[in-house]
Amino acid sequence: MYLQNANESLVVVLTAAKDTLDCSIVCDINDHDASGMITPQVAAQASTNGTTEVTITTGGADKNRQVARLTLYNNDTDIINAVFSKKISGTLYGIVKVQLQPGATAVYSKDGA
């Protein structure tokens, strides 16, 4: 997935209140400009905030941002449901909804692995 400018972002929200702990998020990012991929690669870390939307990463004004890998770990003691969306100028475009048992991890990779 690419975020093509500063008006595009990747967001997550839980569909119900957490029991005790928010989920951990790690997002590995490849940035690209007119010359190609910018190195070194970067990572963004975040935590869910209950039923409040959380921005994981946002595109740049002069670069494309590629989400290379994304993990969501359920730190909670109960099952969680999380919805990931691409947000463009305030409009949400649903990507995926995942349900995780306590201690489980959801993984997205641009390579499909």
What are these regions, as identified by a protein language model?
Residues 1-113:
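Surface-exposed, low-hydrophobicity beta-strand/loop segments enriched in small/polar/acidic residues
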